[in-house]
């Protein structure tokens, strides 16, 4: 899980979702998991 100021899709499997006010990137590749913070 990477915590970044700007979350971006890294590959075509990445999806941007908003969970309880937090922007996250979910992906099949675990290295691509990101959270805005």
From Swiss-Prot:
One Gene Ontology cellular component: cytoplasm
Pfam families cross-referenced by the UniProt entry: Ribosomal_L36
GO biological process, one term: translation
Entry-linked InterPro entries: Ribosomal_bL36 (IPR000473), Ribosomal_bL36_sp (IPR035977)
Keyword Ribosomal protein tagged: yes
Keyword vocabulary terms for this entry: Ribonucleoprotein, Ribosomal protein
Entry GO MF terms: structural constituent of ribosome
SUPFAM superfamilies: Ribosomal protein L36 (SSF57840)
UniProt keyword annotation of Ribosomal protein present: yes
Family to which the UniProt record says this protein belongs: Belongs to the bacterial ribosomal protein bL36 family.
NCBIfam families named among the record's database cross-references: rpmJ_bact
HAMAP family the UniProt entry points to: Ribosomal_bL36
Protein name: Large ribosomal subunit protein bL36
């Amino acid at each position: 899980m990477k915590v970044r100021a700007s979350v971006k899709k890294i590959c075509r499997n990445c999806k941007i979702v908003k969970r309880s006010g937090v922007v996250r990137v979910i992906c099949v590749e675990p290295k691509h998991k990101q959270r805005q913070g």
